[in-house]
């Protein structure tokens, strides 16, 4: 559960200046207070504190009696920063401020709820070590009680205890002296007559080489006897007097207090570990109970020589850890275990110990070497819950840790390497999967798990085959493969790198590397995202190493309708990622829909006639950098509605001799597409655009970032709505349609005169008649309320 408080911060007193860590719309919405556990004082601006800067305040009063300084944002819900009235000019900044004020109010309401008494992850109310005041007395058995009730109850119990102390004062005095006597050794076990009574005994002498001072605990056949009721002990005679005579064969065991410890008896007793303490204050038995149970394959007969098949020993070690309710299986370092398949299955764990953790851990050089067998559902290492339907469908394998070992396959086998199916709370750390003909890593219905530093290499295609599996494959039923985090993972030397298929949601990839290699695929896309949503890639790297006639990265538009409820919803996000193509491609390199790229870099040789970037519907490209290395100048294709390209920088390594910077396809019907802000480095494109006629009447904007007239190197037009023209370069424009209020268009007649034709009534010049721009001349147009006017 997200417990972060964003709009309230407290600092310890001692300083005079304090930072404001949140944004605010007005200083009157910021409150500075002095706070202690039982007092609060709201300070006044200017007289009791002042602003040093927009994000820092300075106290002007003493803090005596208070231990904290609180800075809180409290945005007014009634005092609006922006008021709208009929006929006013609607500006984006006003809308942003109004929207931000609402967002601030909502954020502060959430923080207030969290600070009141939030729920923890288990749904329990969390007072966060604060008092709950004005609590009514409890009535029902499950009600909370207040301190008055507790004091009353303890007072009544105290009266009863005082009576007992008065009656048995001497006894308690003895106990106090006994407890303070450090020369005594307590908890020494003694068994009568070698564990078998003769029968009829009512008096038993404790025969020991040392003096026994008390017998605080006694059992007969495992049944505890109460001192003073079932038995008494006389230190003078060293005799136990029993209320009932023993029966022949009875097992009598007593724990005694002696003057010194017969260590051999203590260690040999059934409870010896409970009687030996440690520096931590815990007994040996308690430490053993709290420690995970350790198992090794060698305990079950594993050889670990890389030649002997250790499948049974490995499986027995895992099953032993599972059946004991959780434990650790330790793989020996610098050891190779040969195996057919290994199964970590939910049904092998007791239901009562469902929450116990299973750890399989290696050290340097721990290797599981697969024999190539494709039995056990064709998976080498399989972690799974119960496979079934109905109530069985919800029984997941949980809390498994795989750490510090390798799973090496046989490339001639089609087996999958590491498979997680119907599992949750799995953690993988530093696991290496290599040389499997099937998927190196496969996740089916996996959620709430962390995959850290997983490396998959040389997986996916059996030698000689042209169609294979993905190095990393993630899928699920509906939205079950969700809420997983992949950190610093690497998929390398795999022809098909990663596929995220239907049923995946809320999967996050951070600082991962996906590099193609080994074989050039001829049919499937190396990076394929289909029917998945709300995926995030951050600081990841994608590398293509082969000349290819197929698309490298594909995000399909076949998304579940339930998830895509609005036309501008973004479902796959790439942030600060890099895409590198070191070879020629003759197909679209990156072909996506419902995808957002933010601050990403694309380096492409673009050896073919297609476009490196092809954006389908609901796609966004912001602050991107594209490098084109060849003379083929194609850069970007926009083929879907509701898309945006903002602040795009294109670097040409050489002057393009063909292609266009941007192409609009999908006509007629393309609408709501905006290209706003672009720059070129080194060289200009061969042609700026193509195919941008017959839009559905919605705005399509092409505005060059920081446009400055660039003489003979400049193209015909930068910044336009839809247009059509005729003539050489062109000679006449007579149909400049649509646009938006305030849009400016710069027209440059590069090699021939250009006529602005007003016959259609769509362009109105200063003179009201046609205007001809001479060769290499420039004119500026502005859209005012849907009508184009000439500025110069």
UniProtKB/Swiss-Prot annotation:
GO molecular function, one term: lyase activity
Domain of life the protein comes from: Viruses
Record keywords, A-Z: Degradation of host capsule during virus entry, Degradation of host cell envelope components during virus entry, Host-virus interaction, Lyase, Viral attachment to host adhesion receptor, Viral attachment to host cell, Viral tail protein, Virion, Virus entry into host cell
Listed GO CC annotations: virus tail
Domain characteristics, as noted in the entry: The N-terminus anchors the RBP to the virion. The central part and C-terminus probably binds and degrades the host exopolysaccharides.
Protein family membership: In the N-terminal section; belongs to the Teseptimavirus fiber family. Belongs to the Teseptimavirus fiber family.
Record-given protein name: Depolymerase 1, capsule KN3-specific
Organism whose genome encodes this protein: Klebsiella phage KN3-1
């Amino acid at each position: 559960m997200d417990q972060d408080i964003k709009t309230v911060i407290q600092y310890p007193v001692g300083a005079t200046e304090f930072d404001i860590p949140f944004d605010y719309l007005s200083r009157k919405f910021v409150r500075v207070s002095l706070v202690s556990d039982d007092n609060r004082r709201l300070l006044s601006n200017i007289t009791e504190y002042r602003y040093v800067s927009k994000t820092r305040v300075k106290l002007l009063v003493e803090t005596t009696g208070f231990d904290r300084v609180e800075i809180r944002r409290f945005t007014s819900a009634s005092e609006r920063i922006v008021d709208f009235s009929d006929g006013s000019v609607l500006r984006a900044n006003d809308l942003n401020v109004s929207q931000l004020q609402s967002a601030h109010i909502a954020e502060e309401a959430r923080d207030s709820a969290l600070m009141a008494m939030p729920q923890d992850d288990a749904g329990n109310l969390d007072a966060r070590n604060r008092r709950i005041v004005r609590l009514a007395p409890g009535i029902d058995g499950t009600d909370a009680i207040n301190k008055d009730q507790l004091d009353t109850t303890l007072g009544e119990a105290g009266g009863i205890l005082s009576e007992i102390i008065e009656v048995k004062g001497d006894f308690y005095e003895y106990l106090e002296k006994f407890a303070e006597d450090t020369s005594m050794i307590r908890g020494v076990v003694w068994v009568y007559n070698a564990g078998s009574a003769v029968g009829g005994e009512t008096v038993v002498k404790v025969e020991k080489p040392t003096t026994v001072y008390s017998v605080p605990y006694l059992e007969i056949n495992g049944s505890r006897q109460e001192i003073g009721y079932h038995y008494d002990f006389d230190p003078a005679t060293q005799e136990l007097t029993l209320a009932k005579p023993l029966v022949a064969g009875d097992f009598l065991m007593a724990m005694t207090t002696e003057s010194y410890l017969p260590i051999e008896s203590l260690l040999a007793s059934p409870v010896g570990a409970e009687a030996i303490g440690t520096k931590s204050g815990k007994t040996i038995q308690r430490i053993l109970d709290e420690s995970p149970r350790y198992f090794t394959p060698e305990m079950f007969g594993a050889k670990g020589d890389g030649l002997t098949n250790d499948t049974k020993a490995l499986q027995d070690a895992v099953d032993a850890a599972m059946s004991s309710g959780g434990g650790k299986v330790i793989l020996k370092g610098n050891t190779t275990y040969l195996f057919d398949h290994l199964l970590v299955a939910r049904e092998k764990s007791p239901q009562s110990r469902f929450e116990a953790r299973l750890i399989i851990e290696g050290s340097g050089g721990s290797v599981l070497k697969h024999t190539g067998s494709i039995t056990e559902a064709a998976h080498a290492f399989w972690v799974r819950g119960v496979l079934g339907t109905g109530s069985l469908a919800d029984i997941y394998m949980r809390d498994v840790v795989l750490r510090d070992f390798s799973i090496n396959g046989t490339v001639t086998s089609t087996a999958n390497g590491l498979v997680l199916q119907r599992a949750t709370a799995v953690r993988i750390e530093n696991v290496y999967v290599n040389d499997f003909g099937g998927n190196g890593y496969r996740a089916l219905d996996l959620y709430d798990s962390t995959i850290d530093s997983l490396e998959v290499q040389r997986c996916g295609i059996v030698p000689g085959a042209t169609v294979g599996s993905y190095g990393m494959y993630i899928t699920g039923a509906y939205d079950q493969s969700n809420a997983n985090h992949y950190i610093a993972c690497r998929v390398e030397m795999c022809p098909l790198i990663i596929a995220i298929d239907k049923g995946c949601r809320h999967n996050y990839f951070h600082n991962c590397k996906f590099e193609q290699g080994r074989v050039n695929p001829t049919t499937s896309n190396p990076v394929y995202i289909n029917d998945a949503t709300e995926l995030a890639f951050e600081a990841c790297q994608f590398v293509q190493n082969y000349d290819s006639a197929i698309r490298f990265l594909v995000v399909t538009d076949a998304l579940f309708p339930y998830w895509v409820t609005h036309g501008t919803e973004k479902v796959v996000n790439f942030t600060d990622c890099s895409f590198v193509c070191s070879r020629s491609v003759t197909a679209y390199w990156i072909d996506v829909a419902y995808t957002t790229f933010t601050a990403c870099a694309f380096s492409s040789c673009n050896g073919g006639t297609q476009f490196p970037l092809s954006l389908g519907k609901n796609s966004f490209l912001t602050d991107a950098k594209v490098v084109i290395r060849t003379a083929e100048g194609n850069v970007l294709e926009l083929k879907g509605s509701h898309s945006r390209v903002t602040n795009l920088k294109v670097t040409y390594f050489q002057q393009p001799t063909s292609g266009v910077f941007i192409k609009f396809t999908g006509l007629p019907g393309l609408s709501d597409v905006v290209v706003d802000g672009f720059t070129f480095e080194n060289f200009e494109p061969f042609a700026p655009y193509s195919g941008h006629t017959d839009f559905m009447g919605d705005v399509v904007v092409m505005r060059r970032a920081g446009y400055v007239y660039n003489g003979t190197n400049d193209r015909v037009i930068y910044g336009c709505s839809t247009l059509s023209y005729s003539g050489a370069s062109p000679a006449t424009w007579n149909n400049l349609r649509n646009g938006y209020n305030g849009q400016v268009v710069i027209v440059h007649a590069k090699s021939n005169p250009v006529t602005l034709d007003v016959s259609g009534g769509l362009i109105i010049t200063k003179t009201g008649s046609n205007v001809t721009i001479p060769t290499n001349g420039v004119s500026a147009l502005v859209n005012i309320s849907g009508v184009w006017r000439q500025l110069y």
